[in-house]
From Swiss-Prot:
Family: Belongs to the universal ribosomal protein uS19 family.
Coiled-coil regions listed in the entry: none
NCBIfam families, per database record: rpsS_bact (TIGR01050)
UniProt keyword list: Ribonucleoprotein, Ribosomal protein, RNA-binding, rRNA-binding
Name of encoding gene: rpsS
Record-level Gene Ontology MF annotations: rRNA binding; structural constituent of ribosome
HAMAP family assigned: Ribosomal_uS19
The protein's name: Small ribosomal subunit protein uS19
Length: 93
């Protein structure tokens, strides 16, 4: 069920403060965050966030089409190594 419109999007306060400070200074430094749950708002466009995926920080450059999504959607947490190809040597007996 989606979030109520009267509540507005959820953004961690510390993350919003960091973006506001960079917007005032007109700088575009990478913002390191563990807040995967924060919703991307229009103030974030053009900024790069280093979103934690559980072991490292993945750089995410925010574009206009990402508004409304969560930061965690763009930093996958699971690595898929692929299915194992059939080993002919072990099957032959």
């Amino acid at each position: 069920m989606p979030r109520s419109l009267k509540k507005g999007p959820f953004v961690d306060e510390h993350l919003l403060k960091k973006v506001d400070v960079q917007n005032e200074k007109n700088t575009k430094q990478v913002i390191k965050t563990w807040s995967r749950r924060s919703t991307i708002i229009p103030d974030f466009i053009g900024h790069t966030f280093a979103v934690h995926d559980g072991r490292k920080h993945v750089p995410v450059f925010v574009t206009e089409s990402m508004v409304g999504h969560k930061l965690g959607e763009f930093a996958p947490t699971r690595t898929f190594k692929g299915h194992i190809k059939d080993d002919r040597k072990s099957k032959r007996r």
